[in-house]
C-alpha cells in the first residue's frame, strides 16, 4: 500500500469540499485492509508495518473529516506555512470582530440571551468560513488567502470552546 498524501490514501480528490460518506467508506476499506488483527499470525515486522498503516489511516481520516483540519492540511500540502504560533497578522475588520466577540463572551457568562446571540454568530462565522474556504481552495486555488482564513477559523473555534465552557447556569 502506498499513498503520497491523505487524499490519495483514500482514493479521493484533494479538495476541501469532499463527500463525507465516500471518505467514511474509503476509511473503512483501508482500515479493514491494515487492521492489526489481520496480521496476528504474521511476522513481527509485518505486524509493525500494519500498525503503522493503521495509525496513518486513522490520523488521515481524523484530519480529513474535520473541515478546519482538512483546510489546514490542504494549505500545508500546498506549501503554506500557517505559523499559527507566530503569525498573528489578521484582517483589521476581523480583529474588530474578535474584540466584539470577546466582549460578548464576558457578558455571556451571566446572560443567557448574550450567550445565545454569540453562539449564533459563531455558527454563522463557521458557515461563512466553510463557504469561503471551498471557493479559495477548490475554485481559486489561492492557498495563501486560504491560510489567512484558516487562522481566523482557528480563532473562532477557540472562542467557541471558551463559550461552551462559559455556559450560564439555568
Swiss-Prot record:
It comes from the Bacteria. Pfam families: HSCB_C. One of its GO terms (molecular function) is protein-folding chaperone binding. Residues 5-79 form the J domain. Keywords: Chaperone. GO terms for cellular component: iron-sulfur cluster transfer complex. Interacts with HscA and stimulates its ATPase activity. Belongs to the HscB family. This is Co-chaperone protein HscB homolog. The gene is hscB.
